[in-house]
Amino acid sequence: MEVKPPPGRPQPDSGRRRRRRGEEGHDPKEPEQLRKLFIGGLSFETTDDSLREHFEKWGTLTDCVVMRDPQTKRSRGFGFVTYSCVEEVDAAMCARPHKVDGRVVEPKRAVSREDSVKPGAHLTVKKIFVGGIKEDTEEYNLRDYFEKYGKIETIEVMEDRQSGKKRGFAFVTFDDHDTVDKIVVQKYHTINGHNCEVKKALSKQEMQSAGSQRGRGGGSGNFMGRGGNFGGGGGNFGRGGNFGGRGGYGGGGGGSRGSYGGGDGGYNGFGGDGGNYGGGPGYSSRGGYGGGGPGYGNQGGGYGGGGGGYDGYNEGGNFGGGNYGGGGNYNDFGNYSGQQQSNYGPMKGGSFGGRSSGSPYGGGYGSGGGSGGYGSRRF
């Protein structure tokens, strides 16, 4: 005889979830990268178990790891947790602030390898740039689309000052940086029937900061390592300026150090007459994404600051330079096969960092070292 639950009590859905998520315990339609959080500012006393004990309150964890120095086994001050579905990640982020072992920590959505090479990828911002919108797209179209991600503060559809014609891009500001992080993980969005590209909107000062950090990264020419601009080619973006051009993101008017918008090229000339988003060293500046810079968290330099590193966590150690992965390797499935068993990265072979310093991630995900940027010589 089947025993039915009391009225009003939700029935368990574990069987349905298991079927939906498959044998590995997660939804096969949701990539691991979207289910993963970087946890910064950890106490050096925090262990895998205590980190798991805290974050499993918001869902099922398929992986949880505190990164440690492979020699000393001391915590590096950060870790990763991976949930079984994106809904659980959202729940954990909605529950901020988080305190683990008596210390307030900083969770952020993990940045993929491909996105990590972009200037400002690790900056905390509340504004996005929406490019490639068409003449028939109005403010309400943008609001209808983006309000499902979070609370919108302002929307600016940019127009030409003289003609009043739309310039093919807009800015949307939210009340929470996590909303931006969640949106930019999905690079392309269909708005009012048109494919649009969405990026973090960086001010002129933030662009210059990102450019100066890249300049310290070494390597020859931009993020790819062996020359070649980030953009390349010369296709038009939006209605006018070159998106890639020969100066990378700077476009025709930007030259090899083209700016984010700066005048003639860039995002459709976006920034124009001395606006905040014009000028600066640009997306195609030289060098890797490394060097000093502003802090990502609360224990030192930036993502490549000071002694390098993911916030300079663990007193100057960096995300690769102090042996993030030590001698261990990542395989094509993002499984870490070194001294700490986990599966938190979308890596493709090679040592995660070696023992190099001078740039974050120790010369790149796929490199064994070197002083290049995030993927300097093997991208």
From Swiss-Prot:
The modification N6-acetyllysine is found at K134. Pfam families: RRM_1. One of its GO terms (cellular component) is postsynapse. The modification Dimethylated arginine is found at R52. The keyword Repeat applies. InterPro entries: hnRNPA1/3_RRM2, Nucleotide-bd_a/b_plait_sf, RBD_domain_sf, RRM_dom. The modification Asymmetric dimethylarginine is found at R214, R216, R226, R239, R246, R286. The modification Phosphoserine is found at S14, S43, S112, S116, S351, S359, S367, S371, S376. It is found in: Nucleus. The modification Phosphothreonine is found at T124. CDD domains: RRM1_hnRNPA_like, RRM2_hnRNPA3. The modification N-acetylmethionine is found at M1. Residues 35-118, 126-205 form the RRM domain. The modification Phosphotyrosine is found at Y361, Y365, Y374. GO terms for biological process: mRNA splicing, via spliceosome; mRNA transport. Keywords: Acetylation, Isopeptide bond, Methylation, mRNA processing, mRNA splicing, Nucleus, Phosphoprotein, Repeat, Ribonucleoprotein, RNA-binding, Spliceosome, Ubl conjugation. The keyword Ubl conjugation applies. Residues 214-225, 347-379 have a biased composition (Gly residues). The modification Omega-N-methylarginine is found at R52, R76, R214, R216, R226, R239, R246, R257, R355. It comes from the Eukaryota. One of its GO terms (molecular function) is RNA transmembrane transporter activity. Residues 1-34, 204-225, 335-379 are annotated as: Disordered. There is a cross-link at K4, K36, K118, K134, K151, K182 (Glycyl lysine isopeptide (Lys-Gly) (interchain with G-Cter in SUMO2)). Plays a role in cytoplasmic trafficking of RNA. Binds to the cis-acting response element, A2RE. May be involved in pre-mRNA splicing. This is Heterogeneous nuclear ribonucleoprotein A3. It comes from Rattus norvegicus (Rat).
